[in-house]
Amino acid sequence: MSEEYERFIDVPSNHEAYMYVNKAYEMGYISGYGGMFYPDRKISFEDASVIFCKIMGLDYYAKALNGYPYGYYNAAKKFGIFKGLKTDRGNEVTYQDTVKMLYNLLNAPLVQNLKTPDSDIVVDVKKDETFLGSYYSVYRAEGTLETVGNSSVKYDSNCSENTITIDGVSYNTDKDYLDYLGM
């Protein structure tokens, strides 16, 4: 028997979530319960807050706020994980809630735990950086796509191959964004 198989006896190697559950365990985001994971069990917002705090790097901060359940719950709430959700303590997380929390995570400010000499936990919030941008180099921008290659929304626009123009700024690209022209 492999180590992975023994980790959670209710998530065998042929289970559809096997790879994801084991990766989340290896990364320290989940721990299970005495060798069981209970993949079909719904979780509460308190349990979800533990996972999201660990992903964001807020584990020590949440523990400093009295840990489980309220420290994690309050940390997740403070950093926007529950933004736009009705999160009554003890309620079960729905699929839609999970999608919203993932969206909020990706758009949350980047945070780092810093230890001070007197062992207090201080959180450094980088408001100009998001989790998504920092870890995946994906950034949100707003503007109008004016040119794609030789196509333009303006008659007198200078267009060239392998470029796009957004709000007057040109970018080199090897992708086709023609379907987004004018948006």
Please describe what each predicted stretch is.
Residues 1-181:
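N-terminal propeptides
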